[in-house]
């Protein structure tokens, strides 16, 4: 079964491609029925049509016409496979024949360009922390100015700068630099803001809106078309200087991040509610002023660690989380995205602010400085364009999932927020964001993937055949979004999965171990946000044992007889590396780093997620062609170069002998051209990996005995540790971690002896 083909055609990948016939049977499978779906996946020869979708008229259905529908050409009627309702086709389908079918009856994924125009161009609201050092601020200014050239000319732009106070810049005033200054230690309400900026009391009913004319006193004067104010905005940015507020010795700068974000979200709510908008926050340190304070301004107060948060010793953590979660709800409800870019060695408070990005589809990027290539290139890649020159980012999206009566939705794990709708196909048990069949994504990109979990609705197994046909469960993903070209679009993907009774060999054969590992990892990461890390790892171990007991072949009490089918055999290995990953093992990571890693993991597709769980290792040598090797200490040899891809960083490691030859300069001698090309080969492959990755990975070039070799050794399975030195020529890893071999021995032992 080619699981990747379904992903290429529809952007969807299921853990089980044949579903159990009943809920009881599904529970026995341990790994839930779920899928990873990429709504805006770049699909070759995607069917794009310029008319509105035809929708089923069944009560509570509203599914879209698709290839699984039964069509009666003579009477111009179609039957919905999800609810069974018979519907009349619109008049323009009258000339349809079996030989000439419209795209939506031939393609399981179709994109509709609707006739509803976009009223307002997207808004880009820059929120800039000016407490940065001059060099860091200069690099940031250069990147923002570059980004202006990548925006559509009709895009609306706005600017806030902040330090101890918050400055809202009035771009409509060309003669002088005019700005409104707000206190950084106050949490303003919308009514106060409207009164201060317009001189009018709103009385709870704002007149400002997308159609309101921009005047010198209107609230929307702070957002103007880029083509009219690019010179003024560039001038303002170029003239920005580091905050002049005096910093007493032993103190951090006063930084009102919370107040700046509060004002930005309120201002957009006041005049552009439900209009596509991005708030881009650039932070050069933690918020030190309430609301949203992460740490006090005194340097004697350290930034919170994981241990502080777990033991309830993080003084400002809960209050800051509550504040930023409220802002996240406001932004998500209004259809506004928040991006957070950190450019400093300190933590900025991503752990507290993560909901701002995770609820709105925004970007969370952790870098050491705004002058680094990681920030510069990642920020510019945010504005990447398609072949037609439009931004690949989409705005104001929502995804509704329709299912046939056999399925119910348990929830979604990904960068979205729930929409309160009354739907019949919602399960009482929740995984991730549940209780709904519709989710809002203020921003979408071709990279965004969502984990969706299903419950089998049938409590008892029903007949698996309907006459001569197999029983099928239908799922339809309907994603409505605003395209950067100024059109409203709807992408519809419809899939069908066969349902069979438990024990049927087709169910086991349909198991996609890669998708299953990523889905279970998403559940584990979601649990880890609220549960104790050790409990989450115990839960993962239990599910692995139960799955192996169910699907492995073995004789009771004989570990040597333990066998897994090829499509199950790698699953324990994925779980082993997941247990050791930075997503669950947070030791040695700051809360901000953990938030960043988990944010990236919960947005990527199956392939990239697997690289994060189990990094890839490629070996280069003079004797052999480049080849993938085991992520194991036995792969580290003196005469090879290793290329490690963890998604977050790409590392080239030179073995001891290679490093000595490189130091001796053999590559500069024409006699050793082969050695020179060997050194270049991994660099060329690394460059290919860097081409379209977001965010840009860190690049590390190291060698045996080098200080940065630890980045490789920490990822390797310690086959050869100081406790067990076996293979000659391999590297000893100094760790107390259990090796994959011992992990598998223990797993086999537990399974064959019937333990849990």
Curated annotation (Swiss-Prot):
Q: Name one Pfam family in it.
A: Gelsolin
Which residues take part in binding Zn(2+)?
Answer: 56, 61, 80, 83
Q: What are the GO cellular component annotations?
A: COPII vesicle coat; endoplasmic reticulum exit site; endoplasmic reticulum membrane; Golgi membrane
Provide the primary localization.
Answer: cytoplasm
Keyword annotations for this protein? Cytoplasm, Cytoplasmic vesicle, Endoplasmic reticulum, ER-Golgi transport, Golgi apparatus, Membrane, Metal-binding, Protein transport, Transport, Zinc
Q: Which InterPro entries match?
A: ADF-H/Gelsolin-like_dom_sf (IPR029006), Gelsolin-like_dom (IPR007123), Gelsolin-like_dom_sf (IPR036180), Sec23 (IPR037364), Sec23/24_helical_dom (IPR006900), Sec23/24_helical_dom_sf (IPR036175), Sec23/24_trunk_dom (IPR006896), Sec23_24_beta_S (IPR012990)
Compartments annotated for it: namely: Cytoplasm; Cytoplasmic vesicle, COPII-coated vesicle membrane; Endoplasmic reticulum membrane; Golgi apparatus membrane
Which SUPFAM superfamilies did the record assign?
beta-sandwich domain of Sec23/24, C-terminal, gelsolin-like domain of Sec23/24, Helical domain of Sec23/24, vWA-like, Zn-finger domain of Sec23/24
**Subunit note:** The COPII coat is composed of at least 5 proteins: the SEC23/24 complex, the SEC13/31 complex, and the protein SAR1.
Q: Which family does it belong to?
A: Belongs to the SEC23/SEC24 family. SEC23 subfamily.
Name by which UniProt lists this protein: Protein transport protein SEC23
Provide the taxonomic classification. Eukaryota, Fungi, Dikarya, Ascomycota, Saccharomycotina
């Amino acid at each position: 079964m080619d699981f990747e083909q379904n992903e290429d055609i529809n952007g969807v990948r299921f853990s089980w491609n044949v579903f159990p016939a009943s809920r009881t049977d599904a529970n026995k499978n341990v790994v839930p029925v779920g899928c990873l779906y990429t709504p805006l996946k770049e699909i070759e020869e995607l069917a794009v049509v310029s008319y509105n979708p035809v929708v089923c008229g069944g009560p509570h259905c509203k599914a879209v016409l698709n290839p699984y529908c039964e069509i009666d050409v003579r009477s111009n009627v179609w039957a919905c496979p999800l609810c069974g309702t018979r519907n009349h086709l619109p008049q323009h389908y009258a000339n349809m024949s079996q030989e000439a079918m419209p795209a939506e009856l031939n393609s399981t994924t179709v994109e509709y360009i609707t006739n509803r125009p976009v009223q307002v161009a997207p808004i880009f609201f820059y929120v800039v922390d000016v407490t940065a050092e001059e060099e860091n601020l200069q690099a940031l200014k250069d990147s923002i100015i570059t980004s202006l050239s990548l925006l559509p000319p009709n895009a609306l732009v706005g600017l806030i700068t902040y330090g101890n106070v918050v400055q809202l810049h009035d771009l409509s005033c060309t003669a002088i630099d005019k700005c409104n200054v707000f206190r950084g230690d106050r949490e303003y309400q919308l009514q106060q803001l409207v009164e201060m900026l317009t001189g009018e009391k709103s009385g709870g009913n704002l007149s400002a809106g997308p159609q309101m004319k921009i005047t010198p006193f209107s609230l929307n004067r702070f957002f103007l078309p880029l083509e009219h104010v690019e010179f003024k905005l560039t001038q303002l940015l170029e003239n920005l200087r580091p905050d002049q507020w005096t910093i007493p010795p032993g103190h951090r700068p006063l930084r009102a991040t919370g107040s700046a974000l509060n004002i930005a979200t309120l201002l957009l709510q006041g005049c552009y509610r439900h209009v596509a908008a991005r708030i881009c926050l650039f932070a050069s340190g933690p918020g030190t002023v309430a609301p949203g304070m992460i740490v006090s301004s005194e340097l004697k107060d350290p930034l919170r660690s994981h241990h502080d948060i777990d033991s309830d010793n993080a003084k400002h953590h809960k209050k800051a989380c509550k504040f930023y979660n409220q802002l996240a709800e406001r932004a998500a409800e209004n259809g506004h995205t928040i991006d957070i870019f950190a450019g400093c060695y300190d933590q900025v408070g991503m752990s507290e602010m993560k909901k701002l990005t995770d609820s709105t589809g925004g970007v969370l990027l952790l870098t050491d400085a705004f002058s680094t290539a990681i920030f510069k290139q990642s920020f510019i890649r945010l504005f990447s364009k398609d072949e037609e020159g439009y931004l690949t980012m989409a705005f104001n999206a929502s995804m509704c999932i329709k299912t046939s009566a056999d399925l119910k939705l348990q929830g979604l794990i990904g960068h979205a927020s729930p929409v309160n709708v009354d739907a019949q196909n919602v399960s009482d048990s929740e995984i991730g964001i549940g209780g709904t069949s519709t989710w809002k994504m203020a921003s979408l990109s071709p990279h965004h993937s969502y984990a969706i979990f299903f419950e089998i609705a049938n409590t008892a197994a029903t007949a698996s055949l309907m006459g001569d046909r197999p029983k099928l469960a239908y799922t339809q993903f309907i994603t409505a979004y605003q395209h950067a070209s100024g059109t409203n679009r709807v992408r519809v993907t419809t899939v069908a999965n066969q349902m069979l009774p438990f024990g049927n060999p087709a169910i086991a054969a349909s198991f996609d171990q890669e998708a299953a590992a990523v889905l279970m990892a998403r559940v584990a990461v979601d649990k880890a946000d609220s549960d104790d890390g050790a409990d989450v790892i115990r839960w993962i171990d239990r599910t692995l044992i139960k799955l192996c007991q169910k699907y492995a072949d073995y004789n009771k009490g004989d570990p040597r007889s333990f066998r897994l089918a090829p499509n199950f055999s790698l699953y324990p290995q994925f779980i082993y590396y997941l247990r050791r990953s930075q997503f669950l093992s947070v030791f040695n990571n700051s809360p901000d780093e953990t938030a960043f890693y988990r944010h990236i993991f919960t947005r990527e597709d199956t392939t990239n997620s697997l690289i994060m769980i189990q990094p890839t290792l490629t070996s280069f040598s003079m004797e052999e062609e480049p080849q993938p090797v085991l992520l194991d200490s036995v792969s580290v040899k003196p005469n090879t170069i290793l290329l490690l891809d963890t998604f977050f960083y790409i590392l080239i490691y030179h073995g001891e002998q290679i490093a000595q030859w490189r130091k001796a300069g053999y590559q500069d001698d024409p006699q050793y051209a082969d050695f020179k090309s060997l050194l270049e080969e991994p660099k060329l492959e690394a460059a290919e990996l860097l081409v379209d990755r977001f965010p840009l990975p860190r690049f590390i070039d190291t060698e045996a005995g080098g200080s940065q070799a630890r980045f490789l050794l920490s990822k390797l399975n310690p086959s050869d540790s100081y406790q067990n030195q076996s293979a000659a020529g391999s590297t000893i890893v100094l760790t107390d971690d259990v090796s994959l071999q011992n992990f598998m021995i223990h797993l086999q032992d537990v399974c064959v002896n019937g333990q849990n």
